[in-house]
Amino acid sequence: MFKKTVLTLAMLGVTTVANADVLTSIKPLGFIANAITDGVTETKVLLPVTASPHDYSLKPSDIEKLKSAQLVVWVGDGLEAFLEKSIDKLPKEKVLRLEDVPGIKMIVDATKKKDHDHHDHDHDHDHDHDHEHIHGHHHDKDWHIWFSPEASQLAAEQIAERLTAQLPEKKAKIAENLAAFKANLADKSNEITQQLQAVKDKGYYTFHDAYGYFERAYGLNSLGSFTINPTIAPGAKTLNAIKENIAAHKAQCLFAEPQFTPKVIDSLSKSTAVKVGQLDPLGAKVKLSKTAYPQFLQAIADEFSQCLTQ
């Protein structure tokens, strides 16, 4: 009887720790959180990597995940507006909204001002029936903060602080994890800076205005972004406009994303005569681990480097 009681209590203890999980809205935030939760508790990700945080619709199972998580980490309604109503119903102490972190807000606000001051007003618009258009960097706040090593470190600090409050018995391990995250990030940032030095003057266009923090952190030469339908081959008018911009600015590469169909990429490649690379903003191929975030940054750096060095 005594042995059974001890076993039951042990099982209950395991269940309690397992339930103290961190749920992040998107995978890149999971990369950051996993570094802090390693050996402490579990990190889970809400959105599938095939989904976009800009237009996702919550399922009933997603609502249950939000309710059962001990800590929910999201950027905020500036990026994931679909989450706002559901998160508003959760206790405030179990929600970490990164938009509200003062240091992160400062980074975002400073970037918005810098983009506004240096915005190129000489850009083209293409108003065909597909609503495809070409633009420089927009004036809205950029909440793709996981591309900022500085903002990501601040996010890690906040996750560590919240987790320590919930699991004080794990304080030492959480602090150890945070220190390791910072050291790994600093080392990786230095490596990427060296790696991209050779391509920092080569211009390129993307199809998603999401990479600004990474571009500024590592000195890349973005010429702007094109907005097109990723599943329908662009029309002649759009292709001509893209070609004109590429020629005018001597762009070396166009960067598509995983949701672009082969037909669209093939059309762009044949019509523009430049290399078409691919960037993965949500790190679909990177597995959650304690070193996942530096691996994610390295994957993005490699994607830039591979296209721009050819």
From Swiss-Prot:
SUPFAM superfamilies: Helical backbone' metal receptor. Belongs to the bacterial solute-binding protein 9 family. Part of the ATP-binding cassette (ABC) transport system ZnuABC involved in zinc import. Binds zinc with high affinity and specificity and delivers it to the membrane permease for translocation into the cytoplasm. Its main location: periplasm. Gene3D superfamilies: Nitrogenase molybdenum iron protein domain. Disulfide bonds join 253-307. The keyword Membrane does not apply. The keyword Transmembrane does not apply. One of its GO terms (cellular component) is periplasmic space. It comes from the Bacteria. One of its GO terms (molecular function) is metal ion binding. It is found in: Periplasm. Residues 1-20 form the signal peptide. GO terms for biological process: zinc ion transport. This is High-affinity zinc uptake system protein ZnuA. Residues 114-136 are annotated as: Disordered. Zn(2+) binds at residues 54, 144, 208, 280. Keywords: Disulfide bond, Ion transport, Metal-binding, Periplasm, Signal, Transport, Zinc, Zinc transport. The gene is znuA. CDD domains: ZnuA. Pfam families: ZnuA.
